[in-house]
Amino acid sequence: MMRPKIYLFGDSITEESFSAGGWGAALAHHFSRTADVVLRGFSGYNTRWAMKVLDKVFPAEMNVGNGRAPLAVTVFFGANDACLPDRCSAFQHVPIDEYSQNLHAIVAYLKNRWPSTHVILITPPPIDEVARLLHRYGEIHSDLPERTNEAARNYAKACVTVARECGAPVVDLWSRMHQFPDWGKAYLRDGLHLTLGGNKIVFEEVIGKLKEVGLSLETLPADLPFTDAMDPNDPLKVFDQMPTTDFKMFRVI
């Protein structure tokens, strides 16, 4: 049985998304009877490095035989690209023009492989600079954070621009979180990575974008019959009807 798939491609914020309360785990639970949610998160990665591993993350054999195009791929990079070039994480920094070019190339790669696949971009989140100093990375003796909220904002704007130019849906996470006055403490556990509340926002925003492109529990059929589709007097009968029965009509709420 080949279930349709949704891929999550990104950095540590994606890699951690299958942890308890993570947005990826929530997506997997949400689509548990309709699609497989596949994690492809790589801590510390930027778009430059993502470009180098595209053919390994999405190998050619995915197109062979009964391979189906993914329903959707989320592309969630930028937090590391936006590292400042004169601080401890300079090796992760990618200039903003190159970041935009790389996002364009990633979207083009995926759409050329699978024209029907929905590619959803997600901007980097905001940065709580005070919290970053409390959770130092490398620059133990520095009073300067390796990331700033201004830089994150610029990369988020660039991501939104690329999405518009590509005609792709986008979750503007930077702007969404800024709608709440206590976003730093509420949504970022260390000034960068997500709290449970932050994961909830990403989940809700991604679900919303998936619905906009027609991917929801209402539109995707269930993989196998639900128990309330079964006749208590002849429960096996439903399996004979599998090729024609739309099981999502019978789902237990």
Feature annotation, model-predicted:
Residues 123-126, 173-175:
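Short, well-ordered beta-to-alpha junction loops that form the rim of enzyme active sites
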Residues 16, 47, 129, 178-180:
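Generic structural signal for helix capping and beta-alpha/helix-loop junctions
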Residues 26-30, 109, 113, 158-166, ...:
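Alpha-helical structural signal in soluble globular domains
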Residues 2-3, 69, 122, 161, ...:
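Conserved catalytic region of serine esterases and O-acyltransferases that act on ester linkages
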